[in-house]
Regions:
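Elongated, mostly alpha-helical coiled-coil "stalk/stator" tethers of large membrane protein machines
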Residues: 1-179
Length: 179
């Protein structure tokens, strides 16, 4: 995430939080970001310098007025005017981080070889909340290469309890013992 994205996203969060709109704006900002990420041609069109800024902003108005809160629309128009619309995903990420910080939420990803059952996911979620004392936004991911066990990534801290990791450790121990 760039410093520009951090600054713009953080500023939007401050405004939305002050107005009690932080949750609504978060949802709309992430939705608009996903939409624009899925339409590279439209995003490119909004970034062409030869098209006057006024026309590019009018395109945003036409597409999003009445669909999103005015703060989100004006934020996108501001980024468009500054030639920084491609920073929108970073801005949304910065906004999300500020939101999570304000509400005591940690993002966690559990990677396993097979899909976790609903019960396993619920138990893991409960255990993580108990251990951290924070609310956990838990996502699960399947990677057959882990072979078994679970690898947790909690905001950049990795806890690797996978079979693959244990085998790698065993391999290193055997290699060190034979030297």
């Amino acid at each position: 995430m760039t410093e520009t994205a951090r600054m713009y996203g953080g500023s939007l969060y401050d405004l939305a939080a002050e107005e009690g709109l932080d949750e609504r704006i978060l949802g709309e900002l992430e939705g608009v970001t996903a939409l624009l990420n899925g339409d590279a041609e439209y995003l490119h069109l909004l970034s062409i310098p030869s098209i006057p800024k006024k026309e590019r902003c009018a395109l945003l108005d036409e597409a999003f007025r009445g669909q999103v809160h005015l703060y989100v629309l004006n934020f996108m128009k501001l980024l468009c005017e500054k030639g920084a619309l491609r920073e929108l995903p970073g801005c949304a990420r910065a906004y999300r981080l500020r939101y999570n910080e304000a509400y005591g939420i940690l993002e966690a990803t559990a990677v396993s070889a097979v899909p976790l059952t609903a019960e396993q996911t619920a138990r893991l979620h409960e255990k993580l909340e108990k251990v951290t004392g924070k609310h956990i936004d838990l996502k699960t991911k399947v990677e057959p290469a882990v072979l078994g066990g679970i690898r947790l990534d909690i905001e950049g801290t990795e806890l690797d309890g996978t079979v693959r990791n244990r085998l790698a450790g065993l391999r290193s121990s055997i290699a060190a013992a034979t030297l």
